Amino acid sequence: MSQPSNSGGGASKGIVKILILAMLAIGIIGLPVGLYEIGTLIATHMAVGDIENGYAYGGLMSIIYNATHISQYQQLSQILPATGVTMGTQDITTIQIFLLLLGLFLDAPLAYMTYNIYRHLEDE
């Protein structure tokens, strides 16, 4: 009696399928979330500079106002710190969203390739 030519290897093929599905799940979720977190780290570093500059320029305008008593400098001394905080917040949001979308766009080919590998294993 002859045995089928593809006998054996069923357990290892099952483990490979499970690993491919796990890689697919980690890739689909992990890549966008990881890039989002990297964006948060980078943007927070950038935002600190914006906030420091806003408060520094606000303090400078306050000193100039105290020396000249021109009301525009007083207004600038009050507005510039808030402007620095706003710019810092915009930095964080922009970079987070950009890297999240980049992760989602990079995710599609990764998921497609992984699915094709899984489907190829199913056909064997």
Swiss-Prot record:
Supply the alphabetized keyword list: Host membrane, Membrane, Transmembrane, Transmembrane helix
Which segments of the protein form a coiled coil according to its record? none
Please state the gene responsible for encoding this protein: SIFV0057
The reply on keyword Membrane is: yes
Q: What membrane topology is given?
A: Multi-pass membrane protein
Q: What is this protein called?
A: Putative transmembrane protein 57
GO CC terms, sorted = host cell membrane; membrane
State which residue ranges cross the membrane: 15-35, 92-112
**Organism the protein comes from:** Sulfolobus islandicus filamentous virus (isolate Iceland/Hveragerdi) (SIFV)
The record's subcellular location field reads: Host membrane
